[in-house]
Amino acid sequence: MHPKIFALLAKFPRVELIPWETPIQYLPNISREIGADVYIKRDDLTGLGIGGNKIRKLEYLLGDALSKGADVVITVGAVHSNHAFVTGLAAKKLGLDAILVLRGKEELKGNYLLDKIMGIETRVYDAKDSFELMKYAEEIAEELKREGRKPYVIPPGGASPIGTLGYVRAVGEIATQSEVKFDSIVVAAGSGGTLAGLSLGLSILNEDIRPVGIAVGRFGEVMTSKLDNLIKEAAELLGVKVEVRPELYDYSFGEYGKITGEVAQIIRKVGTREGIILDPVYTGKAFYGLVDLARKGELGEKILFIHTGGISGTFHYGDKLLSLL
């Protein structure tokens, strides 16, 4: 852990959910194919439940919840949400109750199946997006307060200034873990918290590394504004200035959760060439974007990809994926 980042983060409550540094691997076969050195930070191996990037955010979010005396955690997401499942699981591990406020078709597959197996309370609504779900979450929180409970509401994907600190910490880990001088760090951008944290961490260390986000869903002014606000608010928490701005590229194929032949093929290629499994919603799209941009020479010679996890999402989209291969 880089001492500068360690010192900045020391004042924030944190629960340790990740007992190790996640490894950085070189991808020799993919690198030869695209003409750039590609490395992967295995944040799919963060250790709790199905792993993934959300665990880093939850270390600070649940640390904050416990410091405020919370006894129940509420969060939102799609029925197959990685974030919702690992939030519920982490809360239970820490002795907290959890309520997952979800939208979508109730099928016993993927993360929704895991929610049920683990006995995590779920409430499914006919909502158009996570913003609408947050209204339901706040209503539930108010109801619990009237009952004398102490709820703590976590936004979609854990994308909040506190959650962003998890990937500021990740930059500190990368800085002392690898001797490679990366030109760019590439990550899937959904709710934006991971990309915001990477950008802020690179600013703090004054690293000449480009943070690159591959948008996997809603793209445009709303997303860029949200990302800017996350970075600004997290920087204010830490008392630092922002020097590095992220770059965003749209590889959503039109909408969140839309699976295409390109995504299916890149999942198969990375799996069979490197032995690493990507998911169709986040990392599959993001890695496809990486390959496309790298072939155009837009990411430099040495690229680090953050594997944000999400393997269980593959099973939710199984029939669709197979039909495209």
From Swiss-Prot:
The modification N6-(pyridoxal phosphate)lysine is found at residue 54. It catalyses: 1-aminocyclopropane-1-carboxylate + H2O = 2-oxobutanoate + NH4(+). This is Putative 1-aminocyclopropane-1-carboxylate deaminase. Keywords: Hydrolase, Pyridoxal phosphate. It comes from Pyrococcus horikoshii (strain ATCC 700860 / DSM 12428 / JCM 9974 / NBRC 100139 / OT-3). Belongs to the ACC deaminase/D-cysteine desulfhydrase family. The lineage of its organism: Archaea, Methanobacteriati, Methanobacteriota, Thermococci, Thermococcales. Its EC number is 3.5.99.7. Pfam families: PALP. Its cofactor is pyridoxal 5'-phosphate. It comes from the Archaea. It is an enzyme of class 3 (hydrolase). One of its GO terms (molecular function) is D-cysteine desulfhydrase activity.
